[in-house]
Amino acid sequence: MPVSIEELKALQVQKKEASKPKFISKAKRAEMAAKAKQIQKNTTSEETTLKDIRSTTDLKRSVVQETVETTKPLPSKPKPKSTSGKFSFDWSAADDTSKAYQPSYSIDSGDGQVPKRQKRDLEDAHWSDKPVESMTSRDWRIFKEDYSIVTKGGGNIPNPLRSWNECKEIPGIVRDTISRMGYKEPTPIQRAAIPIALGIRDVIGVAETGSGKTASFLIPLISYICELPKLDERSKVNGPYGLILAPTRELAMQIKDEAVKFCAPLGFKVVSVVGGYSAQEQALAVQEGAELIVATPGRLLDVIDRRLLVLNQCCYVVMDEADRMVDMGFEEQVQKVLASLPSSNAKPDSDEAENLAAVSTRRYRQTMMYTATMPVAIEKLAKKYLRRPGIVTIGSAGQAGSTVTQLVEFLNTDEKRKRRLLDIISKRQYRPPIVVFLNYKRDCEAVSDALVAAGWRTAIIHGGKQQEQREQAVQHLKRGAVDVLVATDVAGRGLDIPNVSLVVNFQMANNIESYTHRIGRTGRAGKRGTAVTFLGQEDDDVLFELKQMISRSEASPNNQELSRHPAARMKKLQQ
């Protein structure tokens, strides 16, 4: 007789009820665990074999399974060995054998995996999260890329500075001075150049303007002087221990002011030898004893020729902005000054000059040269007077800082340029101080008059001004008594005027090097700045290099009119 529909439904309900999981109560589980424990306790020592261990494990597994699964009858006796040749498992086909599997149980404690992972994590960490001892060659490569540092000069170039405290070669009293002066973190040129110089290596530093070059040579120079005997009545007549050459009076005085901050706590004396002041007074100050002299090449050579100063014990020489000294025609004077240094302490031009152990046995003269560009004349000068130098390049040689936005406009007449200049600064987008550059003294007065008529406070610097007038103009600009500085290229190099927001090249510089140094008055010390350049027909010779320079600057937009200009498409051949 066929099964009715009601019976089929009833069977389905029964199967459904039977398939529902049934959980064992806590008391029941405790009872089963007690039974298992009692069974294990009652086994004799003779039966403690591999079979007993397996049975106990199976029993524990059954407890876990019964906690999360349906209640099952106690395991049946093992099936007899099949005689049919077919393999028979010890468990039922309905059993879920993966339920009790826990991956974490498979790793034994103390297998060494955690220490290995910690070591791997340290290796994968960023260099800023590692102690300096754990830095790998890969970490140092990334570090240099982060700060746009490129070093050359053999295999003995030391790694850059990560922080001031990690450089134990700097005397403690100098590190204290660095801290008091507010130097938080080294700049890229300081990170790279200072360790090389402290290793008694000659250094060539090629860095963008406003990059912190001054401290990068003052710190190793003063650290070097700290190791020398104090000047006394007998030794001071032999001249200074250190010499710094700068192309302009303004830059020399600026370096002197910075050097005094470092030297005063150490009891060292700094004297400037520059034009615009009495040579006799300056020579007398040197003869009274000075560990460090900051000078311009022309005035220093004049004092040496008049036998008012000797450099018999000068063992540390710095040439700052060497390319500018060459551009200004001081190359011959620089060479004469260097020739007046004692030849007895010159380094050998051999591998020994790269070996710290070798050069530390004698007190050889150390030379540092800093430049923003690397023309052929500078390469020749370096080859003649520096011995196996370590070369540090920050960014690209001859390129303005990445913090300067460079803009150009084609305006052919001075009247159009004056109106545009007033239009730019009257929008108050750029806050004072502002610097306006021109090529000729006579034009400075006209531009200044136009600015004054529009209500701006101005100061003028050019070669026709007395030294005192030029210094006063710069001080007024720094104090905020003046809004706009109108200047020729005499102020284009070295002057560190804080927070210049805008540079306007009312007339384009005659060459790309001067342009680089002009716009370097803004965007200094990591701050952003803008440089606007007015162009005319007279600037065709520099348009190609100007276009190339702007195109390499990530902060500057490409100017379509400049890009399409015929003179900007091909570099003009030198006559």
UniProtKB/Swiss-Prot annotation:
Q: Which family does it belong to?
A: Belongs to the DEAD box helicase family. DDX23/PRP28 subfamily.
Q: Entry's SUPFAM superfamilies?
A: P-loop containing nucleoside triphosphate hydrolases (SSF52540)
Give every Helicase C-terminal domain span: 403-565
Amino-acid positions noted as binding ATP in the UniProt annotation, renumbered to this chain: 207-214
Subcellular localization, as worded in the UniProt entry: Cytoplasm; Nucleus
State the name under which the record lists this protein.
Pre-mRNA-splicing ATP-dependent RNA helicase PRP28
What quaternary arrangement does the UniProt entry report? Component of the U5 snRNP complex.
The catalysed reaction is: ATP + H2O = ADP + phosphate + H(+)
Its GO biological process terms? mRNA splicing, via spliceosome
Q: What is known of its domains?
A: The Q motif is unique to and characteristic of the DEAD box family of RNA helicases and controls ATP binding and hydrolysis.
EC category: hydrolase
Specify where it is mainly localized. cytoplasm
Motif residue range(s): Q motif: 163-191
* Entry superkingdom: Eukaryota
Could you tell me the EC number(s) of this protein?
A: 3.6.4.13
Q: Which InterPro entries match?
A: DEAD/DEAH_box_helicase_dom, Helicase_ATP-bd, Helicase_C-like, P-loop_NTPase, RNA-helicase_DEAD-box_CS
Any one GO CC term of this protein is: catalytic step 2 spliceosome
> Which species does the entry assign this protein to?
Yarrowia lipolytica (strain CLIB 122 / E 150)
Q: Which SMART domains does the entry link to?
A: DEXDc (SM00487), HELICc (SM00490)
Question: Which keywords belong to this entry?
Answer: ATP-binding, Cytoplasm, Helicase, Hydrolase, mRNA processing, mRNA splicing, Nucleotide-binding, Nucleus
Q: Where is the composition biased (Basic residues)?
A: 566-575
Which residue ranges have biased composition labelled Polar residues?
552-561
Residues spanned by motif DEAD box: 320-323
Which PANTHER family does this chain map to? ATP-DEPENDENT RNA HELICASE DBP3
All copies of domain Helicase ATP-binding, residue ranges: 194-392
The annotated regions of Basic and acidic residues compositional bias extend over 48-63, 120-130
Record region (Disordered)? 35-130, 552-575
